[in-house]
Amino acid sequence: MKLNELYNNIGAKKNKKRVARGIGSGKGKTAGRGVKGQKSRAGVAIKGFEGGQTPMIKRLPKRGFNCISSKKYNVINIYNIEAAIAEERLNANDVITKEKLIEIGLINKSNKKLVKLLSICSDDFNYPLSFKLDSYSSKAKEIVEKAGGKLL
């Protein structure tokens, strides 16, 4: 037996059914789509259409609303700032602003979103940094001021 003499067992590999290749193929003419109508045409069916019955999306009640006055925040944790200082992407003497955080890639550029400083997993923060951000959590304020930093 040689590599060029190897072959699959009979019936192990089925050929794909080729549609619209003559009446004798069994899938010719209408290619298994039936006769006329929306589903026989290109583009198939309308998504979400359930054959005339009230669709599920209409049967469920409406919930909630979008508050126009709500503020959307980019959140940044103190431990992210600590890591950036350790990696020397951020200078400990600089005032930390939204522009600076965008520049080093800690937050995404978005003019509409405000920046909020949080304090998750950062009880041992010891850099006397100055921050000029839009908002601070009460714990973050406490940690920064305890380390000798300023909130501008």
UniProtKB/Swiss-Prot annotation:
A Gene Ontology term for the protein's cellular component: large ribosomal subunit
Ranges of biased composition (kind: Gly residues): 23-35
Swiss-Prot/TrEMBL GO biological process terms: translation
UniProt-recorded Gene Ontology molecular function terms: rRNA binding; structural constituent of ribosome
Pfam families assigned to the protein according to its UniProt record, in alphabetical order: Ribosomal_L27A
Organism domain of life: Bacteria
Protein keywords: Ribonucleoprotein, Ribosomal protein, RNA-binding, rRNA-binding
Spans annotated as Disordered: 18-37
InterPro entries in UniProt: Ribosomal_uL15 (IPR030878), Ribosomal_uL15/eL18 (IPR021131), Ribosomal_uL15/eL18_sf (IPR036227), Ribosomal_uL15_bac-type (IPR005749)
Protein's job: Binds to the 23S rRNA.
Family: Belongs to the universal ribosomal protein uL15 family.
Quaternary structure note: Part of the 50S ribosomal subunit.
Full protein name: Large ribosomal subunit protein uL15
Organism name: Rickettsia bellii (strain OSU 85-389)
Phylogenetic classification of the source organism: Bacteria, Pseudomonadati, Pseudomonadota, Alphaproteobacteria, Rickettsiales
